[in-house]
Amino acid sequence: MEVKQIYTLINSVTGEILGKSDILKEDLSNVVDMGKELFSNTDVDNYVKSLVNRVGKTVFVNRKYSGKVPSVLMDAWEFGSVLQKISADLPSATENESWELVNGTSYDPNVFYKPTVSAKFYNSKVTFEVPLSFTEKQVKESFNSASELNAFISMLYNAVEKSMTVKTDSLIMRTINNMIAQTVDGDTMGVRAVNLLKNYNTLKGLSGANVLTANKALTDPEFLKYASMQIALYADRLGTMSTLFNQGGKERFTPKDMLHIVLLSDYAQATKTYLESDTFNNELVKLPTAETVPYWQGSGTSFDFSKTSKINVTISKKNGSSNTKDVTVSGVIGVMFDRDALGVSNLDRRVTTNYNPKAEFFSNWYKFDCGYFNDLNENFVVFYIADTTSGGGGA
């Protein structure tokens, strides 16, 4: 082990923290060990210079990761592959002839009124697997005890679990992203794809140099008040039967216990910092209870809002159609949707194992099958902020 003398450095540090000298440039390269992958020929004792240093403590990077995505998991089933979803349209009202009686008129009670019922079938899955091989005999020589070996193996299993969590979480977010793109692409009226910034500027009569821009919106308390109000209004509106909030034009309502609200962390934290913290009655401007996500598609290389709020995807134009369309949406700050609008169904996780007796190792294949679906006949609303001069949120 290399031992370095740092008395000169520590004396100058003492002077700095006691206020006896100004801030000096400190050479910390001799203080902080950055680690290395393997031992070198200098890793010997400082007495006879030939005894190899021993590992005194082993720390395994074995932290569990639970993920951070909205909960849209549904049930699974063993037999059959198709998810069938059946719905009925609202029947129309007719004349109540009880109050229109005419002498000598026959009133036929035997008319058949056929209900209008439709069914959707979801019959697709996605799949992947994570393979990993394990040895026992070959790796024993690197540890001092069975407990250390078990901790090492446990770390490998945990690495697989973390890998599976990251991958399944990303697919859940892609299910939401696809619905965002479908909604923005299919809404020309701004009812389901709501550009809060455009609506705010219109409401306030702002134009030209006075218009509020997307890069300043999340630090503007007045805009944040307006956005919070609109999101709360939509949460109430979706509880009332309407055809406006789903692309299929179906009569739908979403009760509070079946309403999902997912907000981008940038927006949720901006509301807390710039709005709620400076308001005496913050309950009046507080956002509805919601889940938060740090990004929709990815963080980019900087976690900048322009990256975290953006999705860039290719969507299928119609159910079962091979026609596709590229859609880019920027400035997405939140979504609100019915429990049945999207989901993850028939999830099947399993492990298959094979032992190789010749080379004395075994391999596990961690397999994953699942069905992800969007239903455009259910309520789904997107909230975004985009400068109107840039052409809105979709492309």
Predicted regions and their residues:
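Short glycine-rich, low-complexity/disordered patches
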Residues: K64-V72, D169, I176-N177, A181, ...
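Long, contiguous amphipathic alpha-helices that act as assembly "spine/axial" helices in icosahedral shell
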Residues: S118-R192, E360-Y366
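Intrinsically disordered or highly flexible coil/loop and linker segments, enriched in small
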Residues: V61-Y65, K162-D169, M173, F373, ...
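Assembly/oligomerization interface modules of large self-assembling protein complexes
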Residues: V48-L132
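Extended, compositionally biased alpha-helical segments that mediate assembly or anchoring
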Residues: M1-N62, S277-A395
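Alpha-helix boundary/N-cap detector
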Residues: M1-Q5, G35-Y47, S147, A151, ...
